Amino acid sequence: LHASLAPSEMCIRDRVLVVGIGPVGLMSVAACKLRGASQIIAVGSRPVCRQAAKYYGATDIITYKEGPIDKHVLDLTNGEGVDKAVIAGGGVDTFDPVIKCLKPGGKIGNVNYLGEGDYVNIPRVEWGVGMGHKQINGGLMPGGRRRIEKLADLITYGRLDVKPLLTHRFDGFEHMEDALMLMRNKADDLIKPVVVFSE
């Protein structure tokens, strides 16, 4: 939640695009809602994640399987585009359509690990030929006790419900490997597994 919130600096009434609605993207959707985004467009295809994105506040959900992301976003925003974007999925080619639907002065927060590809390609014209004031920030969530306490407070005081993320429950430490293998194999109905240790 915090990693996706900070890089693209969402503000009240922003139109925001969240690409990739796995656990990190879903928390990005939740962060956008908490920060007062007026329109939250989520990109994803798995039904369990699309349902969770709606729960967390996505106003629109699109899929890259039905055509270019930028065209969908521009249609949904009457040609205006979005103020901010979070890239939480995809690859090096994801930046191209996101930049194409980002308003001048817009910001992209990348929280996606780019494990393949040599270059991130930036479309020159849609980048404002270098003069569009479009920014890309990327990074991991900063650590520290204070940050974790603030995030825990969101759960404690009912501002954030993480239950929809927990799609698979395992009881006992002996099932840790089962949970990890489930994450590795990425079952269609998986968001996050949880392993519960008995007292």
Stretch-by-stretch model annotation:
Residues 111-112:
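Acidic carboxylate diad motif detector
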Residues 96-99, 144-199:
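C-terminal hydrophobic helical "lid"/dimerization subdomain
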Residues 106-107, 122-165:
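Rossmann-fold dehydrogenase core element
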Residues 25-26:
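N-terminal Rossmann-fold NAD(P) dinucleotide-binding loop
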